[in-house]
Curated annotation (Swiss-Prot):
This is Actin-related protein 3. It comes from Caenorhabditis elegans. It is found in: Cytoplasm, Cytoskeleton. PROSITE patterns: ACTINS_ACT_LIKE (PS01132). InterPro entries: Actin, Actin/actin-like_CS, ATPase_NBD.
Length: 425
């Protein structure tokens, strides 16, 4: 069967998790940790026989590894867990190739020669990294076609699912916050404005660490080896964004029984149950997006200020379009009322600037009000993957993808540039 007749494989590699599945589906078939467990190296020996055995076993050890949940399981003893992706960028290409190998053959159960592939890349990814990706995909896996899509553009596309046709736009500001990194990426007509991208050193993992430290300060009887996982479960199960921190403290102090929650767990070693009272952690965790000084004294700029400053640095003719289409993407933007508070704070900043302009002009200038819209939608958690699934299911995907024949003729440099879909612009 032709590769054009089979659905394309869509793989979104993130710092914490990898989403993979087939084009045309609304959700990824698999969501697995971006971790790989490799065999510990045997200690070196001066014995000639030992050196010979090590050389013979090296090839076998290369095949002896686990990825995803299996890599993190307690059963993976004598293995070292590594993360090939850091802050969204691939750092170890040998491990990444082995990771993709199991993604394709073990999870997707696909023959790579029979499917086109859509992979995602973070903002400001280097052209050299695209070339490395092309070399692995075309030479190691012999794929017939490859398209490397910018995550921000895919997230914008995913937001179309909840909007009318006349409201769909490829101009907008994407707030992509996953487990390891948060990026604010302005996009104009499908092209990323690279010089204006902002990086925020706060993401899901930082929230988990902050909640973990809050629980530790209260000297909770949480098993030390489970403290991180417990904090992570509390974050996902109980946390929300509050409109005013001080008023929220008063609410909890006035009627604690109404707002406190209890997390029940089991000690992984003694198998005895334990419970954790969850109070201020519910709203203080996500609040570090708006008050980063709570956990990081070196970074004190709220996310709303970062967004407003970023938009003001963009070309003047796209600024209103960016304010009107702030799209949320990634699991760390899923907290209840996150979109509402972000929209309120950004609106307050933009209105304050317009009012200052009018005041400084002595009332002669009457600026047109700016409409600030923060878009939250049901595909938000897997927005990047879902956007890739939408695009890879169109006929144009096969026209813009780089083929194996082009790669053999021109080399990996063809993947330095991946055209924007004409149907989207």
């Amino acid at each position: 069967m032709s590769a054009h007749q089979l659905p394309a494989c869509v793989i979104d590699n993130g710092t914490g998790y990898t989403k993979l599945g087939y084009a045309g589906n609304t959700e990824p078939q698999f969501i697995i940790p971006s971790a790989i467990a490799v065999k510990d190296k045997v200690a070196s020996s001066n014995s000639q026989a030992m050196r010979w055995n090590n050389r013979v076993g090296a090839g076998i050890d290369d095949l002896d590894f686990f990825i995803g949940d299996e890599a993190l399981s307690p059963a993976a003893t004598n293995y070292t867990v590594k993360y090939p992706i850091r802050h969204g960028i691939v750092e170890d290409w040998d491990l990444m190739e082995r990771y993709w190998e199991q993604c394709i053959f073990k999870y997707l159960r696909a023959e790579p020669e029979d499917h086109f592939f859509l992979l995602t890349e973070p903002p400001l990814n280097t052209p050299e990294n695209r070339e490395y990706t092309a070399e692995i995909m075309f030479e190691s896996f012999n794929v017939p076609g490859l398209y490397i899509a910018v995550q921000a553009v895919l997230a914008l596309t995913a937001s179309w699912n909840s909007r009318e046709a006349n409201e769909r736009s490829l101009t907008g500001l994407v707030i992509d916050s996953g487990d390891g990194v948060t990026h604010c990426i302005p996009v104009a007509d499908g092209y990323v404005i690279g010089s204006c991208i902002k990086h925020i050193p706060i993401a899901g993992r930082d929230i988990t660490y902050f909640i973990q430290s809050l629980l530790r300060d209260r000297e909770h009887t949480i098993p030390a080896e489970q403290s991180y996982e417990v904090a992570k479960m509390i974050k996902e199960k109980f946390c929300y964004v509050c409109p005013d921190v001080m008023k929220e403290f008063v609410k909890y102090d006035t009627d604690a029984a109404k707002w406190l929650r209890t997390y029940d767990g089991i000690n992984s070693i003694t198998k005895k149950p334990f419970n954790v009272d969850v109070g201020y952690e519910r709203f203080l965790g996500p609040e570090i997006f708006f008050h980063p000084e709570f956990c990081n004294p070196e970074f004190t700029t709220p996310i709303s200020d970062t967004i407003d400053t970023l938009i003001q640095q963009c070309p003047i003719d796209v600024r209103r379009g960016l304010y009107e289409n702030i799209v949320l993407s990634g699991g760390s933007t899923m907290f209840k009322d996150f979109a509402r508070k972000l929209q309120r704070d950004v609106k307050r900043l933009s209105d304050g600037r317009l009012q200052m302009s009018e005041t400084l002009s002595g009332g002669r200038l009457k600026p047109k009000p700016i409409d600030v819209q923060v878009i939250s939608h049901k595909m938000q958690r897997y927005a990047v993957w879902f956007g890739g699934s939408m695009l890879a299911s169109t006929s144009e995907f096969y026209q813009v993808s780089h083929t194996k024949a082009e790669y053999m003729e021109r080399g990996p440099s063809i993947c330095r540039y991946n055209p924007v879909f004409g149907a989207l612009t």
